[in-house]
């Protein structure tokens, strides 16, 4: 026992000497040890006596008396099948099945309870807005419901953060409409009221609905929801891409979309409007009719006017401009950036910059375009979110934290290769196709790069974009012919001797289901010009557009005078286009130079007149160019001619410049895109000769924009264009750029 005491003394723990007997010896004196030893001896003796008594009992009674060790053992054992170890190993699958059964049984029970009238949860949802709304502030749409004894609700066709869009039939106007139902919440109502104000402002300046902006018919309050009634439109461009299995549409069709979009942006840039859309993307560009290429821009819910910017976080990420990513002030140029991204996506089928977040987005932009200029990053509040400044003053892209994503070196993912300029288009899929030559792709690439300029101040503006050679038919190349469209506000002049001017234009841009307010071609309409009639025979179409009546956005550096000189150019049988040319800017610097004259003899002329192609002189583009316009059909597998011969002649008034004694003449021909259609079958082609005359020795440069110079003549004069559209069939037919695309009649919300 003494030994045990020593062991206990040097080991601060309890030593178990018998079942249920232990003592702690730390700090005990010898007397204490002896006392404990005596107690231990007494307990053992008592235990031995108990054992002897138990052994004297009969055998059966001994079994009923458990031994001391048996007292701690369980009297009954669980079923081995229910043991946790077995359930989590051998019977693991059974365990999971049981869990699922219990879970789904509870879920089903809750669902059944929810169906009952006594469900407090259901009662809570039903009380929103007297039972008309759900708990998300959205109106509960009921198919077949009739509103205000006028609108019959057909179905829900769209949903977003703003609310919902339903297809409805307007009994009063006997037409289908799309009704945008705003959430019953103050913040959404306030934003929607801004949208209504902007839409009404645009409608006021676009009474004939020819600028590719969705038409707001009316708005009203219904059961505490603001409702916006729009014309019914068709697919959006994302749906169109999906129908191509994301392989993209032809370059010809991309051109038609591009020209309409540039015209729409030119309209939004009108000084009285100055509207920034702030959310341009394929989903917000809708076809008017599933069989035509006319489009309209929708969803102005995020829009604002210049000077009234209220949001910093705008634009969908894939189409977000660098200035927005960098937290810099923005203007109308952000929409041009978005358009550049959209056009590439429409042709390649894939987003150009598909960032998963803002850092990834900027990194993908840098892959293609390189590091933004230092003067931009030096002023950008959020520059250090994406870049780091080197001691020498240059900027480099920050390394990603995770290190998992690897990007190509800045500027090495060339747009040239993405478009397949020299390799037959994206993925080589356009090799050998008409209208997809290297020259066509080079023009497209150049336009895109101008749209994707890092510097918003030098990014191409709609006015100049519409004059880009991508939209012009060339005489010496077989490009942009049968399906191309050139209705830009071109200022084109070439040598000849004539005194009259005319411009040819097709129509397009209306809803396929609504013809309200449309001015149609009048073949006998008399214009107030000295040159005769503008005659045209145009087949009736589901979707029309007209040449715009533009309050022209002036080139950079121009100011609007109090009494501008008017230059009137008649561009359509039923309307005229007036541009205001500031008198203070009419005397612009002249650049003298000689250029080669390209003569293009067309096969069809009125009265045997010889027509020369016009010569456009720019710093970048000096190829002869003419304009063509088409009005095709998307009828699959059929040839459909929608226009017959069209000839015209108009006269433009001349403007004179007196500050230096020289007299100048400039014609601003603004002829936005025709209602060119998605070519789903073989179509007849149409040729247009556009000729304008000027002094070959004097050219006028427009101040404020270094990239373009345009011709102007000295001395009073007139401009002439003689257009003749001929329908050619047989060998000249071109395969449809969208052959094989399935078109389904499933209208998309117009906003």
From Swiss-Prot:
The residues annotated as the active site are 279 (proton acceptor)
| Residue window of motif Bipartite nuclear localization signal | 109-126
Q: Protein kinase domain: which residues? A: 151-471
Give positions of region: Disordered.
59-81, 104-129, 477-532, 580-667, 730-751
Q: What ranges does the record list as Polar residues composition bias? A: 59-68, 477-493, 611-622, 742-751
Q: What is its main location?
A: nucleus
Q: Name one GO biological process term.
A: protein phosphorylation
Q: Which CDD domains does the entry mention?
A: PKc_DYRK1 (cd14226)
Q: Where does ATP bind?
A: 157-165, 180, 230-233
Locations of Low complexity compositional bias?
494-517, 623-633, 642-660
PROSITE patterns for the chain: PROTEIN_KINASE_ATP (PS00107), PROTEIN_KINASE_DOM (PS50011), PROTEIN_KINASE_ST (PS00108)
Quote the biased-composition stretches of kind Basic residues, using this chain's numbering: 589-609
Look up the EC number in the record and give it: 2.7.11.23, 2.7.12.1
Q: Name one GO molecular function term.
A: protein serine kinase activity
Could you tell me which InterPro entries the record lists for this protein? Kinase-like_dom_sf (IPR011009), PKc_DYR1A/1B (IPR044131), Prot_kinase_dom (IPR000719), Protein_kinase_ATP_BS (IPR017441), Ser/Thr_kinase_AS (IPR008271), Ser_Thr_dual-spec_kinase (IPR050494)
Subcellular location(s) of the protein: Nucleus; Nucleus speckle
For this record, an example GO cellular component is: nuclear speck
Q: Which UniProt keywords apply?
A: ATP-binding, Kinase, Nucleotide-binding, Nucleus, Phosphoprotein, Serine/threonine-protein kinase, Transcription, Transcription regulation, Transferase, Tyrosine-protein kinase
Q: Where is this region: Histidine-rich domain (HRD)?
A: 585-613
Q: What class of enzyme is it?
A: transferase
Q: What is known of its domains?
A: The histidine-rich domain (HRD) region is intrinsically disordered and promotes the formation of phase-separated liquid droplets that enhance its ability to phosphorylate the CTD (C-terminal domain) of the large subunit of RNA polymerase II (RNA Pol II).
What does the UniProt function comment say about this protein? Dual-specificity kinase which possesses both serine/threonine and tyrosine kinase activities. Plays an important role in double-strand breaks (DSBs) repair following DNA damage. Mechanistically, phosphorylates RNF169 and increases its ability to block accumulation of TP53BP1 at the DSB sites thereby promoting homologous recombination repair (HRR).
Family (UniProt): Belongs to the protein kinase superfamily. CMGC Ser/Thr protein kinase family. MNB/DYRK subfamily.
What protein am I looking at?
Dual specificity tyrosine-phosphorylation-regulated kinase 1A
Instruction: Write down the species.
Output: Xenopus tropicalis (Western clawed frog)
């Amino acid at each position: 026992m003494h030994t045990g005491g020593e062991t206990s003394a040097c080991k601060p723990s309890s030593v178990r000497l018998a079942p249920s007997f232990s003592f702690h010896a730390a700090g005990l004196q010898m007397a204490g040890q002896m006392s404990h030893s005596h107690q231990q001896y007494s307990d053992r003796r008592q235990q031995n006596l108990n054992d002897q008594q138990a052994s004297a009992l009969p055998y059966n009674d001994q079994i009923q008396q458990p031994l001391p060790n048996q007292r701690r053992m369980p009297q009954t054992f669980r079923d081995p099948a229910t043991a946790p170890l077995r359930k989590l190993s051998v019977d693991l699958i059974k365990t999971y099945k049981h869990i699922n059964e219990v879970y789904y049984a509870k879920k089903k029970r809750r669902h059944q309870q929810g169906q009952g009238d006594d469900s407090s949860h259901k009662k809570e949802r039903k009380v929103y807005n007297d039972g008309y709304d759900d708990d998300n502030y959205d109106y509960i749409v009921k198919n077949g419901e009739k509103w205000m004894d006028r609108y019959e609700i057909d179905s829900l066709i769209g949903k977003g953060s703003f609310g919902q869009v339903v297809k409805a039939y307007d009994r009063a106007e006997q037409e289908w409409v799309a009704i945008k139902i705003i959430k019953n919440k103050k913040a959404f109502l306030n934003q929607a009221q801004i949208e209504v104000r902007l839409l009404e402002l645009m409608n006021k300046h676009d009474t004939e609905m020819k600028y590719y902006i969705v038409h707001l018919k009316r708005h009203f309050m219904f059961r505490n929801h603001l409702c916006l009634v729009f014309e019914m439109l068709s697919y959006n461009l994302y749906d169109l891409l999906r129908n191509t299995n994301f392989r993209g549409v032809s370059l010809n069709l991309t051109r038609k979309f591009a020209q309409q979009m540039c015209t729409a942006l030119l309209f939004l840039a009108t000084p009285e409007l100055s509207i920034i859309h702030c959310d341009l993307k394929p989903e917000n560009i809708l076809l008017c009719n599933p069989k035509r290429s006319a489009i309209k821009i929708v969803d102005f819910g995020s829009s604002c006017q210049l000077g009234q910017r209220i949001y910093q976080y705008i634009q969908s990420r894939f189409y977000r401009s660098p200035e927005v990513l960098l937290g810099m002030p923005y203007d109308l140029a952000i929409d041009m950036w978005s358009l550049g991204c959209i056009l590439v996506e429409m042709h390649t089928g894939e987003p150009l910059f598909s960032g998963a977040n803002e850092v990834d987005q900027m990194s993908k932009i840098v892959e293609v375009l390189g590091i933004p200029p230092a003067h931009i990053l030096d002023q950008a509040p959020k520059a250090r979110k994406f870049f780091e400044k080197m001691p020498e003053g240059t900027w480099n892209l920050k390394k990603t934290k995770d290190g998992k994503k690897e990007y190509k070196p800045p500027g090495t993912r060339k747009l040239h290769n993405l478009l397949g300029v020299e390799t037959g288009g994206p993925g080589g899929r356009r090799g050998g196709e008409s209208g997809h030559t290297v020259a066509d792709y080079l023009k497209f690439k150049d336009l895109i790069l101008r749209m994707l300029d890092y510097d918003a101040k030098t990014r191409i503006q709609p006015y100049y974009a519409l004059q880009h050679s991508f939209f012009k038919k060339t005489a010496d190349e077989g490009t942009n012919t049968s399906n191309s469209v050139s209705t830009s506000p071109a200022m084109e002049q070439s040598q000849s001797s004539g005194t009259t001017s005319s411009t040819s234009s097709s129509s397009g841009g209306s809803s396929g289901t609504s013809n309200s307010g449309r001015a149609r071609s009048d073949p006998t309409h008399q214009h107030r010009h000295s040159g005769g009639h503008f005659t045209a025979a145009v087949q009736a179409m589901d979707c029309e557009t007209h040449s715009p009546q533009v309050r022209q956005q002036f080139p950079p550096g121009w100011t609007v005078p109090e009494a501008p000189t008017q230059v009137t150019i008649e561009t359509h049988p039923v309307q005229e286009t007036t541009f205001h040319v500031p008198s203070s800017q009419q005397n612009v610097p002249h650049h003298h130079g000689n250029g080669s004259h390209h003569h293009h003899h067309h096969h069809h002329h009125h009265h045997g007149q010889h027509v020369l192609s016009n010569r456009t002189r720019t710093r970048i583009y000096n190829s002869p160019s003419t304009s063509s316009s088409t009005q095709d059909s998307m009828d699959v597998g059929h040839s459909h001619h929608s226009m017959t011969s069209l000839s015209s002649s108009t006269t433009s008034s001349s403007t004179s410049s007196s500050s230096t004694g020289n007299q100048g003449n400039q014609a601003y021909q603004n002829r936005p895109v025709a209602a060119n259609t998605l070519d789903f079958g073989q179509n007849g082609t149409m040729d247009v000769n556009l000729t304008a005359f000027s002094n070959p020795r004097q050219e006028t440069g427009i101040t404020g924009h270094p990239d373009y110079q345009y011709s102007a003549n000295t001395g009073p004069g007139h401009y002439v264009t003689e257009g003749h559209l001929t329908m050619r069939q047989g060998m000249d037919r071109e395969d449809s750029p969208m052959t094989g695309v399935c078109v389904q009649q499933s209208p998309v919300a117009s906003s």
